[in-house]
Swiss-Prot record:
Mg(2+) 2 binds at residues 98, 119, 121. Residues 3-10 are annotated as: Important for interaction with ALDOA. Substrate binds at residues 122, 213-216, 245-249, 265, 275. The keyword Calcium applies. NCBIfam families: PRK09293.1-1. Mg(2+) 1 binds at residues 69, 98. SUPFAM superfamilies: Carbohydrate phosphatase. Pfam families: FBPase (PF00316), FBPase_C (PF18913). Binds 3 Mg(2+) ions per subunit. Its EC number is 3.1.3.11. The record marks 33 as: Important for the conversion from active R-state to inactive T-state in the presence of AMP. This is Fructose-1,6-bisphosphatase isozyme 2. The modification Phosphotyrosine is found at residues 216, 219.
Length: 339
C-alpha cells in the first residue's frame, strides 16, 4: 500500500479557480462575485433536476415562452433561481433570459457593470424523459455610460468576458472560459463544490461524428444535404461518420467538444434564419468551442462576429472540429458558386 490518500487536500475548486483568475487580472472582484453567484444557481438547478420526479416538477407549467416553446415547471424554477442569484450578486445591470420577453434591468441599489445573457434550462423538452439538459450563459461588460437598457446586451460575441455551460447528465459538469482556454469542472456531491477535472481542453482537429436533426432532411439546403451525404458515403473509401443527436444542445455540443466532429443546426426552409438563439445559446457555446481550438459559423460568418439586432434573434449554427467545419463551409461555397 502506498501512502497516497484517497482524499485530495489541495484540490482546485471552481470557487478557488474564479478567485485566482480575478486576482491575476487585478480586478475589482465583481466578476468573481458574479461567477460564484452563477455557480450557486447551477448547483440549485442541479439539485432540482435530480429531485424533479419526486418534487412534482415534471410537466408543463401551462404557458408558452417568448420564443414559442412550452414552458416546463423546471424552466420557471431555474429561471427564477438564476435571476435572483445574479441580481443579488451586486454585479449585474442587465439580464437577458430565454424565458423573458424583455431584458431585466437590475434595480439601482443592486446594480453592477456586467450584462448576462442566459438560457436557464436548455433542452427542457427532454426533461420528462430524463435526457441530459443544461444551463448556458455569456457575460459582457456594459459599454455605454447611459442608464442600463436592452441595447447593452446587443453586443457581438467577440466582446464576451466569460462564458460557459452546465450539463446535468450522469454527473453535473461546468465548462468555463474567461478567455484563456476552456476548463472542465465536475460537481462533487459530497463536497457541494465543483472540482477541476480537465484543464485547457482542446477539441480534435477532425472527428468521426456528425450531429444534426435528420428529421428535417426534407427542408435542408443543397450544401447541408451534400455534406451529410459525404459523411454517410465518403468518396475516398474511408469509414462513414457516426451519427449522434440528443436534441439537447448542451449535450450535443459537449459531446462534440470531448470527442470531436461537427454539430449542425443550419438554416433550412422551415427556419430560414436558423432556430437557435444568438445571445444565450449560440454565442456562449461558440466562444467555448473557439477557445478550445474549434470553429463556430453561421455558414456565412463566424458566430462571434454577428452583430445582434434583437435579444431573441435566431441564427444558424455549425460548430466543431476545425477541419470538419471547414469541409462544411467548402460545400456551402461550392453550392453558392454553382447558383
Amino acid at each position: 500500500m502506498g501512502d497516497r490518500s484517497p482524499f485530495e487536500t489541495d484540490m482546485l475548486t471552481l470557487t478557488r479557480y474564479v478567485m485566482e483568475k480575478g486576482r491575476q487580472a487585478k480586478g475589482t472582484g465583481e466578476l468573481t462575485q458574479l461567477l460564484n453567484s452563477m455557480l450557486t444557481a447551477i448547483k440549485a438547478i442541479s439539485s432540482a433536476v435530480r429531485k424533479a420526479g419526486l418534487a412534482n416538477l415534471y410537466g408543463i407549467a401551462g404557458s408558452v415562452n417568448v420564443t414559442g416553446d412550452e414552458v416546463k415547471k423546471l424552466d420557471v424554477l431555474s429561471n427564477a433561481l438564476v435571476i435572483n442569484m445574479l441580481q443579488s450578486s451586486y454585479s449585474t445591470c442587465v439580464l437577458v433570459s430565454e424565458e423573458n420577453k424583455e431584458a431585466i434591468i437590475t434595480s439601482k441599489e443592486k446594480r453592477g457593470k456586467y450584462v448576462v445573457c442566459f438560457d436557464p434550462l436548455d433542452g427542457s423538452s427532454n426533461i420528462d424523459c430524463l435526457a441530459s439538459i443544461g444551463t448556458i450563459f455569456a457575460i459582457y461588460r456594459k459599454t455605454s455610460e447611459d442608464e442600463p437598457s436592452e441595447k447593452d446586451a446587443l453586443q457581438p460575441g467577440r466582446n464576451i468576458v466569460a462564458a460557459g455551460y452546465a450539463l446535468y447528465g450522469s454527473a453535473t459538469l461546468v465548462a468555463l472560459s474567461t478567455g484563456q482556454g476552456v476548463d472542465l469542472f465536475m460537481l462533487d456531491p459530497a463536497l457541494g463544490e465543483f472540482v477541476l477535472v480537465e484543464k485547457d481542453v482542446k477539441i480534435k482537429k477532425k472527428g468521426k461524428i456528425y450531429s444534426l436533426n435528420e428529421g428535417y432532411a426534407k427542408y435542408f439546403d443543397a450544401a447541408t444535404t451534400e455534406y451529410v451525404q459525404k459523411k454517410k458515403f465518403p468518396e475516398d473509401g474511408s469509414a462513414p461518420y457516426g451519427a449522434r443527436y440528443v436534441g439537447s444542445m448542451v449535450a450535443d455540443v459537449h459531446r462534440t467538444l470531448v470527442y470531436g466532429g461537427i454539430f449542425l443546426y443550419p438554416a433550412n426552409q422551415k427556419s430560414p434564419k436558423g432556430k437557435l438563439r444568438l445571445l444565450y445559446e449560440c454565442n456562449p457555446v461558440a466562444y467555448i468551442i473557439e477557445q478550445a481550438g474549434g470553429l463556430a459559423t453561421t455558414g456565412t460568418q463566424p458566430v462571434l462576429d454577428v452583430k445582434p439586432e434583437a435579444i431573441h434573434q435566431r441564427v444558424p449554427l455549425i460548430l466543431g472540429s476545425p477541419e470538419d467545419v471547414q469541409e462544411y463551409l467548402t460545400c456551402v461555397q461550392k453550392n453558392q458558386a454553382g447558383r
